[in-house]
């Protein structure tokens, strides 16, 4: 396996990560809990975040035991909270009666509580739909991450971008303003991009590297795919893993992120992922 392949991230809402077999030569395993939202039902809470992952399966005690399991090993494990949404449901907003500073204050307080309760290491920002102007998004999200980092509540901060131009512009601006507080960028390869039919692998690889170039100063650029069949509309799993095989020798790519959500929603078992990644990364 290429020594450049270092980070493996699982994006999940349940405890499927507990039995995950980590791909060979990985130096860091990240679990990203999906999701915390500042919504109570369908109503925005203007920065007051609530865990919406399976809190019966993923408890503070479960995370404590998970981390303890790897203490004797050389593998670093980190657990992050992901804030965001999917499609048009629960979009980012600071509320009609709110403002950026008020949102940042409320978000910092609520996420501080979640991070301390669950002993989390970082935050991931993954909004696919943003119902705010660019300045409000950048100032709010950037201010939140800055507060968490400066108060030493987290050690890892990432955001997820894609080929969706309307969405990506928000993250370009966020990174331009707050680059020092983000160490990881995740590219959601299945969102907003359809590879050419003539040469899908080459066109997907070209797109990934173009996006990676926009964030070339970041510590870790991860390429993401999904085990959920509804996310496969633009291209199938084999296209992704063949593309990953070609990318892992490239210094621009530091690892992979796999969206599992739960064992119940995955269209191929999570236990296959390490084997597929090993095949993709073998040289």
Swiss-Prot record:
<protein>
    <recommendedName>
        <fullName>RuBisCO-associated protein</fullName>
    </recommendedName>
</protein>
<dbReference type="Pfam" id="PF00704">
    <property type="entry name" value="Glyco_hydro_18"/>
</dbReference>
<keyword id="KW-0378">Hydrolase</keyword>
<keyword id="KW-0326">Glycosidase</keyword>
<dbReference type="GO" id="GO:0016798">
    <property type="term" value="F:hydrolase activity, acting on glycosyl bonds"/>
</dbReference>
<feature type="domain" description="GH18">
    <location>
        <begin position="5"/>
        <end position="283"/>
    </location>
</feature>
<comment type="subunit">
    <text>Forms part of the RuBisCO complex.</text>
</comment>
<dbReference type="GO" id="GO:0005975">
    <property type="term" value="P:carbohydrate metabolic process"/>
</dbReference>
<feature type="active site" description="Proton donor">
    <location>
        <position position="128"/>
    </location>
</feature>
<comment type="similarity">
    <text>Belongs to the glycosyl hydrolase 18 family.</text>
</comment>
<dbReference type="InterPro" id="IPR017853">
    <property type="entry name" value="Glycoside_hydrolase_SF"/>
</dbReference>
<dbReference type="InterPro" id="IPR001223">
    <property type="entry name" value="Glyco_hydro18_cat"/>
</dbReference>
